[in-house]
């Protein structure tokens, strides 16, 4: 489906953006999150310049995204290492099983 215009209110300003219908709810949640972040920043920093608040919020969001990407990379590397260890353990167990007779007195040919 093609994108459709969506009207948003960001920190008291109207903004119209195009968005696929199936992503409309996610966009609305993102706008709500941004509004909350801007409001929190305004209260915490006492900055009244909207443009400055938007830049600070953008930097914070970018930093959080960078941190999450690093966590994801670290997690993927950790899982890859665990999978390799499990694979080696399984391969060794299969090799050991092939070397060990299943019943006492059974001999390999």
From Swiss-Prot:
Superkingdom of the source species: Bacteria
Transmembrane annotation, as ranges: none
GO biological process: division septum assembly; FtsZ-dependent cytokinesis; septin ring assembly
Keywords: Cell cycle, Cell division, Coiled coil, Cytoplasm, Septation
Compartments, as annotated in UniProt: Cytoplasm
Location, primary (coarse class): cytoplasm
Coiled-coil portions: 21-97
A Pfam family recorded for this sequence: ZapA
InterPro entries: Cell_div_ZapA-like, Cell_div_ZapA-like_sf, Cell_div_ZapA_eubact, Cell_div_ZapA_N
PANTHER family assigned to the protein according to its UniProt record, in alphabetical order: CELL DIVISION PROTEIN ZAPA (PTHR34981:SF1)
Family: Belongs to the ZapA family. Type 1 subfamily.
Role this protein plays: Activator of cell division through the inhibition of FtsZ GTPase activity, therefore promoting FtsZ assembly into bundles of protofilaments necessary for the formation of the division Z ring. It is recruited early at mid-cell but it is not essential for cell division.
Full protein name: Cell division protein ZapA
Protein's organism: Enterobacter sp. (strain 638)
